[in-house]
């Protein structure tokens, strides 16, 4: 009897092993396809290259001069004779009046560093000049009650810098390119050509010293205006062109947050508790990236907290979340510290900090900084930001100009608390670069202009490559938001959408807590350099479902 059971066990084990090997082989094949279709990884090596046939004749007109627009202008300068950037704000001002989250905490994924290195020569030295750093992409994450830890050196590098400083870096580089012209103003109209297949010219209402109306011929028009979505409005209101309408799907997670730039006195840098207590997570101030990121489960708390060293001698300390009341805004740094302690305890299922050396050290570090700021008479100011709805625009459902593209939030906006906005725009930029390189330019006889032009299929090719690379961010963040109280759903949808993903994510976290290699694989996907399919690797999926029986 025992021998029979042993034979059965052996055969079951062999069959299960073969089945898993087959699944892994199928998954590996699908993954190779997914790397190309759902990430911009294969585009990175081609950044900075020129089209073999030469430059496209005419202007690439870029509406919007923020992060997406500036990066788009850099890429277009390699392919077009001239680039015109239209931006309502003055490029001489450091502040950004039209970007709500300009002074808030920003997360930058590893893909952002890779793209920026590809489009800007000597990017790292420029980054250091502006107070930024390159470090491992360790977010010091606690998801629910689970801390995620990693083997040193197992994570990809990313950049640490404030949004304002990064934008200043990009502005300086854009201004150094002689073929890029920056016009302060707003695009007010687009004019189709006689075939109504493409945009022929763009009308601009200038601002500043000159308030004249300008017109620019457009070899390509890129909407990089973010939530203003100027391209949507201009295309749909262009009469007799037959463009649009384009369905816009939106939901509102009711996100708000507040951030303060906290100076760290020089006398404290080497003696902060997170450094002196010999913790694995922290080494020195010069190598400090994230201090802590805490994302409680929905039933624990609707607030999240993040602390990161941004530029030079400062920490950016933020708190935000879903459908928060006015009382949730920190009024002072002391109030912020109390909120961090409260959120941390809620995320830890009510457990105190006793016995958690890392948690105690972080809280003691914050309190030490608070005391020092009091001694120096410095009162940090928390700046509040309330975000609008998340949305996607379906430009594939109706006719559109063949030389029209849209980059970043002007096409797809996701919940900013996940920190994907800039990286998502840079994925679009890398995709645009690849599509132009792969495009067969048409001669003047096809466009009515001298030199080379874009083919009639260009816009469709861009959207076909762009959508699968960014739409998974919409799907995953939307599914997460639907698990939060107060989220206003897409009309006709229910909170059940995304429930499997939310439950599976908790189970995957359990695996990551026990397996540092799996944790690193998961983070690479979240850093947008590996496909989301990596979260469904058979060995990970099976373990996730097993650990799910114990998931909180």
Give the residues covered by each predicted segment.
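Feature captures the FAD/FMN-dependent oxidoreductase FAD-binding
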Residues: 19-24, 118, 122-218, 224-230
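Predominantly flavin-linked oxidoreductase catalytic cores and closely associated redox partners
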Residues: 176-342
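C-terminal helical "tail/cap" subdomain of flavin- and related membrane-associated enzymes
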Residues: 6, 17-38, 434-552
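Glycine-rich Rossmann-fold phosphate-binding loop(s) that bind the pyrophosphate
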Residues: 64-67
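Short beta-strand "acidic-cap" motif of Rossmann-like dinucleotide-binding folds
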Residues: 81-87, 462
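N-terminal FAD cofactor-binding segment of flavoenzymes
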Residues: 75-79, 91-142
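Extreme N-terminal leader/targeting segments of oxidoreductases
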Residues: 1-61, 78-82, 91-95, 151
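FAD/FMN-dependent oxidoreductases across multiple families
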Residues: 323-431, 435-461, 465
């Amino acid at each position: 009897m025992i021998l029979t059971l042993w034979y059965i066990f052996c055969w079951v084990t062999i069959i299960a092993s073969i089945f898993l090997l087959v699944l892994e082989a199928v998954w590996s094949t699908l993954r190779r396809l997914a790397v190309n279709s759902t990430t911009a990884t294969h585009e990175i090596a081609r950044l900075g290259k020129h089209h073999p046939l030469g430059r496209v004749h005419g202007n690439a007109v870029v509406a919007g001069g923020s992060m997406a627009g500036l990066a788009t202008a850099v890429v277009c300068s390699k392919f077009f004779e001239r680039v015109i950037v239209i931006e309502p704000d003055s490029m001489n001002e450091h502040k950004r009046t039209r970007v709500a989250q300009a002074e808030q905490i920003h997360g930058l994924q590893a893909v952002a560093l890779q793209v920026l290195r590809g489009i800007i020569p000597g990017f790292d030295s420029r980054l250091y000049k502006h107070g930024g750093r390159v470090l491992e992409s360790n977010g010091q994450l606690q998801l629910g009650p689970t801390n995620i830890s990693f083997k040193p050196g197992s994570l990809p590098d990313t950049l640490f810098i404030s949004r304002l400083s990064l934008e200043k870096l990009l502005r300086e580089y854009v201004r150094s390119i002689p073929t890029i012209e920056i016009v302060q103003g707003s695009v007010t109209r687009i004019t189709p050509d006689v075939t109504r297949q493409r945009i022929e010219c763009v009308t601009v209402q200038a601002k500043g010293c000159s308030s004249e109306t300008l017109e620019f011929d457009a070899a390509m028009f890129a909407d990089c205006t973010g939530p203003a979505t100027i391209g949507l409005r201009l295309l749909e209101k262009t009469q007799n062109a037959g463009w649009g309408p384009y369905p816009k799907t939106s939901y509102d997670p009711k996100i708000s947050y507040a951030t303060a730039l906290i100076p760290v006195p020089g006398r404290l840098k080497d003696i902060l508790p997170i450094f002196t207590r010999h913790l694995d997570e922290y080494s020195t101030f010069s190598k400090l990236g994230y201090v802590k990121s805490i994302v409680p489960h929905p039933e624990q708390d609707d607030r999240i907290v993040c602390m990161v060293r941004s530029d030079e001698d400062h920490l950016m300390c933020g708190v935000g979340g879903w459908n928060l009341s006015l009382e949730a805004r920190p009024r002072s740094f002391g109030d912020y510290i109390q909120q961090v302690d409260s959120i941390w305890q809620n995320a830890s299922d009510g457990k105190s900090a006793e016995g958690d050396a890392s948690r105690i050290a972080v809280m003691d570090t914050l309190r030490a900084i608070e005391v020092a700021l009091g001694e120096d008479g410095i009162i940090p100011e928390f700046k509040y930001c309330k975000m609008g709805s998340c949305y996607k625009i379906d430009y594939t459902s109706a006719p559109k100009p063949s030389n029209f593209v849209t980059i970043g939030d002007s096409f797809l906006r996701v919940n900013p608390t996940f920190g994907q906005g800039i990286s998502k725009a840079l994925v679009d930029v890398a995709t645009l670069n690849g599509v132009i390189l792969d495009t067969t330019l048409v001669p003047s006889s096809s466009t009515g202009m001298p030199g080379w032009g874009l083919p009639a299929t260009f816009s469709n090719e861009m959207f076909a490559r762009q959508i699968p690379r960014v739409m998974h961010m919409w799907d995953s963040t939307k599914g997460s938001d639907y698990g939060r109280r107060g989220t206003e759903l897409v009309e006709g949808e229910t909170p059940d959408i995304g429930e499997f993903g939310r439950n599976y994510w908790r189970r995957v976290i359990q695996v990551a807590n026990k397996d540092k290699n799996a944790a690193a694989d998961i983070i690479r996907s979240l850093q947008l350099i590996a496909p989301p399919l990596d979260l469904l690797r058979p060995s990970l999926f099976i373990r996730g479902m097993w650990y799910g029986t114990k998931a909180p």
